[in-house]
């Protein structure tokens, strides 16, 4: 008899699932917030979830759908989220009313690598920030410059040797060898002479991290579930690798600074100071002991921030220089002039003083903002100034730097590579929130000084020896890799790297 009821049971199940996965889809309509129609199971992130498109590209497309709206109501699977377009509203969220949006809202187990400065929220983040932010102030990367310089020289020697065999390179993976070795030296004190095996190990870690993460997809579908189940988004193999690496370094240095002035030295100096405390907000202070686990988590995020983002940004800059010979000529002239004035040496100060180089780097970051989208979580109900829209507590707020950076309201001909956009006069005309490659406010990218320095040093060294030219395999219409969390080139970037003495 049951067979006669089977179709009815299936029908009820399908209808129940439909209503379950669409139960929130009137949330924004009830609040008179416009947005695209969501689809069952996926909300507005179908292309990202499958994955057919990178999350940053999806957010840019959503941004462009409603050009007259200040905010757009969207759904991350079934969860209502708010995509903010208006720059003044962004300024309130990131700066003026930061205490309401101080959390990123990335919820998973904070054990192990989860207690890092990027992902931590609440009092844990404040405690970490109070103690660890000084590590990334301008003076600290300057002290590491000698390590970066040694790495850049080794990298140029490697490229020169490879050029004798073949002048065409896939520059994204090529530049990863530079940033990985530099991070290994600046973060973990691994000398360039003994770097081979460690870099191979870090390369394996990168491949594990870059694989599609089902944990992240699960968090998108059911926000907060990973935290409730005490699950991490980081594979156990990655956690074990960094724990072993940090344990060995701490043991080699007897738990004390070694005098190298690298990242581990700075953290060991902080550990000698005792607990990390936070009392910026509220009347009660919280504390966090700097354990080996906390050190491991910060070492991990330093590696992630300095390795992939810098390599990708440099690869995109190299790509644009290959397609823009006039701009490349100006940069080479500036590099030659600086080297001539400094006896052929590249110093910390000369890197910062090269105005056109810095403008070209800023323009690269405008066109290719690597971390997309920016995310915050409301810690209480918040009424958006100048509107009737109330962001309820725990709502995720998203910002699309890519959408803003390609908005013709803020940048003429936004698809054109034009470093002159960053003349001081032009920058002064723009809203401060029209440029967000590093985020903004207290939760901006604290590693931006380090990343910028190692990138500009490397590009300077490259242009002092080589010209960049399109190869027969250079893709004139680069696509974004859909499977990685960061913005990156699908299929890599192929160009010719030609020794300048061979250029007619």
UniProtKB/Swiss-Prot annotation:
Main localisation: endoplasmic reticulum
Entry keyword set: Endoplasmic reticulum, Heme, Iron, Membrane, Metal-binding, Microsome, Monooxygenase, Oxidoreductase
Organism: Helicoverpa armigera (Cotton bollworm)
Name of this protein: Cytochrome P450 6B6
Enzyme's top EC category: oxidoreductase
EC number: 1.14.14.1
Domain of life: Eukaryota
Xref: PANTHER family: CYTOCHROME P450 (PTHR24292), CYTOCHROME P450 6A16, ISOFORM B-RELATED (PTHR24292:SF100)
Membrane topology: Peripheral membrane protein
CDD domains cross-referenced by the UniProt entry: CYP6-like
UniProt-listed Gene3D superfamilies: Cytochrome P450
Catalytic activity: an organic molecule + reduced [NADPH--hemoprotein reductase] + O2 = an alcohol + oxidized [NADPH--hemoprotein reductase] + H2O + H(+)
Similarity field: Belongs to the cytochrome P450 family.
